[in-house]
Amino acid sequence: MRALLILSLGMGLANAEIIESGPGGFTVRTTLQIKAAPDEVYRKFMHDIGEWWNPAHTFSGDAHNLRIEDHPGGCLCEKLPNNGFTRHLELITLAPGKRLVFSGAMGPLQTLSATGTMQFVFTASEGGTKLDTIYAVAGFLEKGMNSWAIPVDMMLAEQVTRFKSYVETGKAASK
């Protein structure tokens, strides 16, 4: 099953695509162009996640509780009340300015028998940077993992579109 969604959120378009979807899992990809150099895009991605991630897609309700740790075994983690935390994804590959690969299940997928691999690829392009986001998720649910493909695809497309707006204008796009 292939589906293509063109998502328009404030500033620009993101091509969001469900590459594969079936009972055992799904793969989604979002591609967009950002009008900034790859080094700047990468730096803002790594260090400013609290400025552009939608707080509605956090457990704490505050995107400033998110952080990306850029060392072996690092993570995309979130601080929770009372010294709590959640480790959304583990960083398994870091090629500064070029590529990040994470392993794990984000958000509500953590409570399911699911895991995934998420890649962020930063490529120099005419006028800036092409950002490809690919998330492959596998697992078991009685009614199939494919029911999660569309919501995950839409959530990721929203986040990277907000990121694009943040890099280009200094403010994340709102819905």
Regions found by a protein language model. Name each.
Residues 1-7:
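Sec-dependent signal peptide recognition
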Residues 14-63:
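Hydrophobic ligand-binding cavity/cleft-lining segments
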Residues 27, 107-154:
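Beta-strand/loop substructures that line and gate deep hydrophobic ligand-binding cavities in soluble
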Residues 30-32, 87-93, 116-124:
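Hydrophobic/aromatic beta-strand elements that line small-molecule binding cavities or substrate pockets
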Residues 41-42, 76, 91, 102, ...:
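Hydrophobic pocket/interface hotspot
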Residues 48-88:
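Short beta-edge strand/loop motif at the mouth of beta-sheet-based domains
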Residues 98-105:
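Short, solvent-exposed secondary-structure boundary/capping segments
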Residues 165-175:
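Short, highly charged C-terminal tails/helix-capping segments
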